[in-house]
Amino acid sequence: MAKKNREKIKMISSAGTGHYYTTTKNKRNTPDKLKLKKYDPIIRKHILYNEGKIK
């Protein structure tokens, strides 16, 4: 059985609303933490989302 290259991550809103997106990333190709601008429906704006671990 092959080892999984992609791990599940949680993209957490930097606005502190508690909203998050889940996605996967390749651990080998992107060892650094991700930062993406995505839409936060609670405050209805595009803001920065930071990578966090799924518990």
Curated annotation (Swiss-Prot):
Taken from the record, one Pfam family name reads Ribosomal_L33
**Keywords from the named record:** Ribonucleoprotein, Ribosomal protein
Identify the domain of life.
Bacteria
One GO cellular component term noted in the UniProt record for this chain = cytosolic large ribosomal subunit
Write out the transmembrane intervals.
Answer: none
Any one GO molecular function term:
structural constituent of ribosome
HAMAP family the record matches = Ribosomal_bL33
Entries under PANTHER family matching the protein: 54S RIBOSOMAL PROTEIN L39, MITOCHONDRIAL, LARGE RIBOSOMAL SUBUNIT PROTEIN BL33M
Tell me which family the UniProt entry assigns to this protein: Belongs to the bacterial ribosomal protein bL33 family.
Q: Report what the protein is called.
A: Large ribosomal subunit protein bL33
The protein's organism comes out as Buchnera aphidicola subsp. Schizaphis graminum (strain Sg)
Q: What is the gene called?
A: rpmG
